[in-house]
Amino acid sequence: MAKRVKRAGRKREKKHVERGIAHIHSTFNNTIVTITDPAGNTISWASAGTIGFKGSRKSTPFAAQMAAESAAKSAMEHGMKTVDVYVKGPGAGREAAIRALQAAGLEVSLIKDVTPIPHNGCRPPKRRRV
């Protein structure tokens, strides 16, 4: 039987960043929370899908809360204390994700809505008929 060779994996180095930016991308189907340093380099991220939610459960505020909590805990291991929050998109998890970041122990110093609004650009999807 072949012997298993243990590959020397690259150990991720701990960055010590006290201030960062939390980007919350909230769509109708999912919520993605990315925490970066001020230069834009990703420190931690999580989405409703990576937490374990599938299908329509990903679009709930609770799923967004869990994703934000997971990303915040990971960022706090790198020494993060304060974040500016940039929220993008129309999804259900916007407010829940912000509240979860605060509850996890990160100090929120700024909340900014950066949702892109077209000046009559692309044609939107057709209206749903239920």
Curated annotation (Swiss-Prot):
Q: Which organism is it from?
A: Thermoanaerobacter pseudethanolicus (strain ATCC 33223 / 39E)
Transmembrane regions listed in the UniProt entry: none
Q: How does it assemble?
A: Part of the 30S ribosomal subunit. Interacts with proteins S7 and S18. Binds to IF-3.
Entry annotated with the keyword Kinase: no
Keywords annotated in UniProt = Ribonucleoprotein, Ribosomal protein, RNA-binding, rRNA-binding
Q: Which SUPFAM superfamilies match?
A: Translational machinery components
> Protein name, please?
Small ribosomal subunit protein uS11
Q: Name one GO cellular component term.
A: ribonucleoprotein complex
Task: Report the GO molecular function annotations.
Answer: rRNA binding; structural constituent of ribosome
GO terms for biological process? translation
Residue spans making up a coiled coil are none
What function is annotated for this protein? Located on the platform of the 30S subunit, it bridges several disparate RNA helices of the 16S rRNA. Forms part of the Shine-Dalgarno cleft in the 70S ribosome.
Regarding protein family, the annotation reads: Belongs to the universal ribosomal protein uS11 family.
At the top level of its lineage, which domain of life is listed? Bacteria
